[in-house]
Regions:
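Short, gly/Ser/Thr-rich active-site loops of penicillin-recognizing serine hydrolases
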Residues: 52-56, 65-66, 71-74, 134-172
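Short, surface-exposed beta-strand/loop micro-motifs that present aromatic residues
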Residues: 103, 110-123
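Short, glycine/acidic-rich beta->alpha junctions
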Residues: 28, 106-108
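Short beta->alpha transition motifs characteristic of CBS
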Residues: 107, 127-131
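Short, surface-exposed loop or secondary-structure junction motifs
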Residues: 1-101
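A broadly conserved detector of short glycine/acidic/proline-rich loop/turn motifs that flank catalytic sites
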Residues: 90-92, 120, 129-130
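Short intrinsically disordered coil segments
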Residues: 100-104, 143-144
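Glycine-centered small-residue hotspots that permit tight backbone geometry or close packing
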Residues: 17, 108-111
């Protein structure tokens, strides 16, 4: 009941609470790349646990080595900014222009994004739905909106000057 509708599918049915990703659908509806349904409160809790190196409310959830593995560049594909399940800052990162080099994040097809900045202890969560009511309504600038919102969060925390000259931004 707390999940918003995703989109109207090709059968003219409103999808709500089910993964709408075609690849996940072909894999039985559940896959590691799509279909996270959550709230900002739950994502903030999870993000704080990741920021704490795997601990939340004095309970260890993940080993520090696991968090480090999840959030370090995998380099499976040379030059990739991908971690195991996350992305890291590079080029035009969805986390905006002020995230530190010690950050990791993830985006979703519907325009959602989550970035966790370990250096600055900042978490920015954006839950949106750029494909509602139909994915054809998805604006090509939705990615830019996410960048602007993440950047505005850093500006509001007076972190703009601290991070505006990081090396990876030279290609921005």
């Amino acid at each position: 009941k707390r999940i918003v509708p995703t989109e109207i599918n090709e059968n003219n049915s409103l999808i709500k609470g089910y993964v709408h990703d075609e690849n996940a659908y072909k894999l039985g509806g559940v896959a590691g790349h799509a279909g996270l349904f959550s709230t900002t409160n739950d994502l903030a809790t999870f993000s704080q646990m990741m920021l704490n190196g795997g601990i939340y409310r004095w309970k260890r959830i993940f080993k520090p080595e696991t968090v480090a593995l999840f959030t370090s560049r995998a380099n499976v594909i040379g030059g990739s900014s991908r971690c195991y399940g996350w992305d890291s800052p590079s080029g035009k990162a969805s986390g905006g222009v002020y995230i530190s080099d010690d950050s990791f994040g993830h985006t979703g097809f519907t325009g959602t994004s989550l970035w966790i900045d370990k250096e600055n202890e900042v978490i920015v969560i954006l839950l949106t739905n750029a494909v509602h009511p139909k994915r054809e309504s998805k604006s090509p600038t939705y990615f830019e909106w996410g960048q602007r919102i993440h950047s505005a969060a850093y500006e509001s925390l007076n972190l703009k000057e601290k991070n505006e000259n990081l090396d990876w931004r030279k290609n921005w």
